[in-house]
Amino acid sequence: MSAEPELIELRELAPSGRIGPGRTRLERANALRIAPGTTRNPSQQHVPGRGHRFQPAGPTTHTWCDLCGDFIWGVVRKGLQCAHCKFTCHYRCRALVCLDCCGPRDLGWDSALERDTNVDEAVERETPDLSQAETEQKIKDYNGQINSNLFMSLNKDGSYTGFIKVQLKLVRPVSVPSSKKPPSLQDARRGTGRSTAVKRRTSFYLPKDAIKHLHVLSRTRAREVIEALLRKFMVVDDPRKFALFERTERHGQVYLRKLSDDEQPLKLRLLAGPSEKALSFVLKENDSGEVNWDAFSMPELHNFLRILQREEEEHLRQILQKYSRCRQKIQEALHACPLG
């Protein structure tokens, strides 16, 4: 990546630009792993899908399939997850996985700090409401402490604009529209928003050191920041698959807190000051195990109920068959025993 920070201008999002829950399901094309600074030789023979060790996902795994993009739903069968690279998919999608396992990803963070990391619950932080004079003074103090030109500016209506830096710390692959060649970071930098006519998708791993600067309003919400980042990389995965975290360092420990959808990152940045240790933002997979059912559409919720009913019926059928076989064996043993 270039040393120059790439800026994403994020103003008001029009309703038509929002990413709704009922998008067209995308089909999987050939999935490739793109290593930063390398190109894939078409003449090389490649056997896809090697190295994975899939095992049943845990009972708290509520996430989206890395292959088809659909939500992984169920109580008994939660899907599969690779023990090495955390690739997660439906049972039905296992045979279609073409992306090779990359092994455990070292994301280059301070190992001494990461061992003592505390991940707080996704509780919205109480932020004080600043008056116009207090906001103006805070912005003046903030601009006086930074060593770059990424200043904050106060608007006439009392809102303000500024820059936030987001580090993409993603373990699992992301999906982009399929093309003749895999997209690079340079392609994403030149690209536009995601197309609604996309029918196929390609998977790759984002570089571990991917960082984006976003120019946002004070009222820009965390969910809008996530959507803007995905559009910039042309990622077609569901935005609910990801979450924005605030990262702070205190007394040699790293604390992560998941931001709620309606929190305002620029306001948090202003209150914390420009220090990266006091506050930084990280984009990660939303693997907290919590599901915001209000974010799903009515057809999706009805579909989940149908899946739950089918799974319940299948589970009951298996239990009845198990007890029926046991009963039959006991009866056979009784008939085989001599009388007296």
Swiss-Prot record:
Compositionally biased spans, kind Low complexity: 175-185
Zn finger region (Phorbol-ester/DAG-type): 51-101
PROSITE patterns: RA, SARAH, ZF_DAG_PE_1, ZF_DAG_PE_2
Annotated region described as MOAP1-binding, given as residue ranges: 311-314
Biological process annotations from GO: DNA damage response; positive regulation of protein ubiquitination; protein stabilization; Ras protein signal transduction; regulation of cell cycle; regulation of cell cycle G1/S phase transition
Residue ranges, annotated region (Disordered): 175-196
Keywords per UniProt: Acetylation, Cell cycle, Cytoplasm, Cytoskeleton, Metal-binding, Microtubule, Nucleus, Phosphoprotein, Tumor suppressor, Zinc, Zinc-finger
InterPro entries in the cross-refs: C1-like_sf (IPR046349), PE/DAG-bd (IPR002219), RA_dom (IPR000159), RASSF1-6 (IPR033614), RASSF1_RA (IPR033600), SARAH_dom (IPR011524), Ubiquitin-like_domsf (IPR029071)
Residue span(s) of domain Ras-associating: 194-288
UniProt feature coiled coil, ranges: none
CDD domains noted in UniProt: C1_RASSF1, RA_RASSF1, SARAH_RASSF1
N-acetylserine: modified positions: 2
SUPFAM superfamilies found in the cross-reference section: Cysteine-rich domain, Ubiquitin-like
Region spans: Mediates interaction with E4F1: 2-115
GO cellular component terms given for this protein: centrosome; cytoplasm; microtubule; microtubule cytoskeleton; nucleus; spindle pole
GO molecular function: small GTPase binding; zinc ion binding
SMART domains referenced in this protein's UniProt entry, alphabetically: C1 (SM00109), RA (SM00314)
Disulfide bridge positions per record: none
Nucleus recorded as keyword: yes
Origin: domain of life: Eukaryota
Gene3D superfamilies given in the database record: 1.20.5.110, 3.30.60.20, Phosphatidylinositol 3-kinase Catalytic Subunit, Chain A, domain 1
Protein task: Potential tumor suppressor. Required for death receptor-dependent apoptosis. Mediates activation of Mediates activation of STK3/MST2 and STK4/MST1 during Fas-induced apoptosis by preventing their dephosphorylation. When associated with MOAP1, promotes BAX conformational change and translocation to mitochondrial membranes in response to TNF and TNFSF10 stimulation. Isoform A interacts with CDC20, an activator of the anaphase-promoting complex, APC, resulting in the inhibition of APC activity and mitotic progression.
Subunit structure: Interacts with MAP1S and XPA. Binds to the N-terminal of CDC20 during prometaphase. Binds to STK3/MST2 and STK4/MST1. Recruited to the TNFRSF1A and TNFRSF10A complexes in response to their respective cognate ligand, after internalization. Can self-associate. Part of a complex with MDM2, DAXX, RASSF1 and USP7.
Record-given protein name: Ras association domain-containing protein 1
Gene (UniProt): Rassf1
